UniProtKB/Swiss-Prot annotation:
Catalyzed reaction equations: thymidine + ATP = dTMP + ADP + H(+)
Pfam families found in the cross-reference section: TK
Name of the protein described by the UniProt record: Thymidine kinase
Record key words, sorted: ATP-binding, Cytoplasm, DNA synthesis, Kinase, Metal-binding, Nucleotide-binding, Transferase, Zinc
GO BP field: DNA biosynthetic process; thymidine metabolic process
Enzyme class: transferase
Subcellular location as annotated: Cytoplasm
GO cellular component, one term: cytosol
Binding sites annotated in the UniProt record for ATP: S9, A10, M11, N12, A13, G14, K15, S16, D87, E88, C89, Q90
Binding site for Zn(2+): C145, C147, C182, H185
EC number: 2.7.1.21
Primary location class: cytoplasm
A GO MF label: ATP binding
Amino acid sequence: MAQLYFYYSAMNAGKSTSLLQSSYNYRERGMNTLVMTASIDDRYGKGKVASRIGIESDAQVFSSHDNLIEMITAAHQENHLSCVLVDECQFLSKEQVKQLTYIVDKIDIPVLCYGLRTDFQGELFSGSHYLLAWADKLVELKTICHCGRKANMVVRLDGEGKVMREGEQVAIGGNESYESVCRKHFREFIWD
């Protein structure tokens, strides 16, 4: 039976690396996968999933308005899919997460989603909210804070490296813009 997985973490925990490894494992066994990523995140080029350690893969992009059932079933008809892997899944809409449950429940294709749980203010992203509610399996990938504790929060940095407390929920960036921290340090930076 196929299941919907949500692999979540703060930044720099290896989400994209894990996704690429999972896709490779399927393909190594002669199975087809569909790697997808949000069109909003083009840090490594449009239609690319890339890891900080240097591995990458082409990916089909989706926007918040795309119908994932149509996209995935078209790919499945072309290349019998054994697995769908979604990077940057925090950018999925509620309806798209519901569509992924359809892919799992009705078409019987496993879907592995990888993304952030919360934004730089500690608030859930829409995609993460519904994946936490509806996924069959929740898996936390871990990274560490500068103090050595588990980092489960993210802070946004301005151009001078200072923590920002306000701003739009989505601002695409990497290590120059974000830092993963433990809740204790998040509290000091944001809440206190």
